[in-house]
Amino acid sequence: MRYEVQTYMSPQEVMEMAISFFGVGLDLELQSQGFGSLHFVGGGGHVTLTTRDEDPVSVELETREWDAQVEEFMARIARRRWWRRLWKGVKEELA
């Protein structure tokens, strides 16, 4: 299954969170890592994550056997953090 979500996190933050969520949290093996992409395998399936540096950042996920966990990850990164909104407002006022 393929999914796409937008986030206000940076691509680096998304990658770090994915490694923590899928690798450490779900014990999937990080099989490959490239510029803006990660590929995890385990439990008879896989998760592939690719980021595109846009505003907001676009994250594409492809999975087999890990759909519920991918949907949970998407919900976590899609939340807009209150401090990001605050910082954006401060930057606009200072400009």
Located regions from the model:
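Short, hydrophobic/aromatic-rich segments at coil-to-beta transitions
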Residues: 32-39, 58
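Residues that act as N-cap/strand-start positions at coil-to-secondary-structure junctions
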Residues: 24, 32-34, 43
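Generic intrinsically disordered, low-complexity segments enriched for polar/acidic and small residues
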Residues: 18-19, 37, 70
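Alpha-helical structural elements
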Residues: 16-17, 35, 61
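Beta-strand/loop substructures that line and gate deep hydrophobic ligand-binding cavities in soluble
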Residues: 41-95
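Residue-level marker for the onset of beta-strands and adjacent loop->beta junctions
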Residues: 1, 34-36, 45-47
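Terminal, regulation- and interaction-focused segments at domain boundaries
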Residues: 1-30
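Short amphipathic alpha-helical segments, especially helix-boundary/capping motifs
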Residues: 12, 33, 47-51
